[in-house]
Amino acid sequence: MKILKFENLGGEIPLLFENDASLPAIKFRLVFRASGAICAKNGVANLVCQMLDNGTASLKKAEFASLLETRAINLQAFCGAETFGFEILCLKEHFLYALDMLLKLVDEPNFSDEILAKVKDEICAEILDLSSDFDEVANDNLNKIAFANTPMAFNLRGEIADVENIALSDVREFWAGLNLANAYVFLGGDIGENDEKFRQKIAQILAKFKFGVARNLPKFTSKSDLFTHQKVQSEQAFIYFCAPFDVCEDELFIAKTAMFILGGGGFGSRLMEEVRVRAGLAYSCYAMAKFSHATRMLKGYLQTKNENAKDALNLVKKVINDFCENGVTQDELDAAKAFLAGSNPLRKETAFAKMAICESEFYDGKEFGFGDKELEKIKNLDLQTLNNFIKNHDEISKLCVAIVSANDDENL
């Protein structure tokens, strides 16, 4: 993959380009960094994303969708915690048409009172439906205590009250805030580097946004040693937990190895073996590193019977404390190295999967091939270095915990 650029739009916009003619298909992404849900009023980014699934002001949803479907074009807006953007995946023969449709969408999005009301109703219905998804509830409750009074405390959808209070002016303000200073373009597949008809059309799409001033994502740190419980009618207890994980850049490969051994590796990982296999206290138990531009943390979860919730949580805490105090064994390190090295080719089975890895490396500010270099560091990681790292990061034992169960509080 190479980095090209678009110019004459108020500044330079990076273009991540990769030619691969193994399939007659093209993937396009326009990504606005520092423009996702945590950068906006609660619920607004997700609502705007869903409004963009309702066609244009002149081509309503059914007609717009039909024109895409007859050509097997996948065109959609997407919204994450940190990013907002558009994606196209289609056959090469329909790519120019797909770009035309995206140009129509960004030129006259269907931001009307009617569509706003419709989408608000749909999102509120979704929120109500998810209120009985206790994994979702436990995760949301965890974020509310771990990141209280920050945008990280809320999920992409927001609360019903947040959604109901969104006005059309909020939608237009968010849309106007998408600027090219924070954007990049990804273009990969069966396409030439110098194919001007495509580049010109993409430039027309970019020109619909102002260049603006680059924004940086805010940083958030998880709180420690907090607990919340919500009593519900359920046959199971849902336990979610997190802790801050203050890792510097040159330690990331060590952190990933450590977390794989602790709880990210499924069967064979420390938590799964102790909590499920030996003690029989959970159906599953995981913990992994969550590293993003906005936060770095350990996050985990498990499900168990209501009557086992207290014992299961206590065992999780014991396992993590022991992990921090005593580290790992050489056998565990060797097994982690073998799995991580062996599974790496599976991440690159398709051309678009390889391109996605390169895009992720670019987004993280790394050079292309960073992941392979990191894997080499993992292969050469020695036990003493790993265990010293683990002992220096006992902050991961200071858990914030959210439980959703049928238990009374005094039984937890």
Predicted features and spans:
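His/Glu-rich zincin catalytic helix
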Residues: M1-F64, R172-E274, L313, K398-L412
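Charge-rich, well-structured scaffold segments of protease-associated domains
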Residues: E63-V213, F245, R278-A279, S284-L412
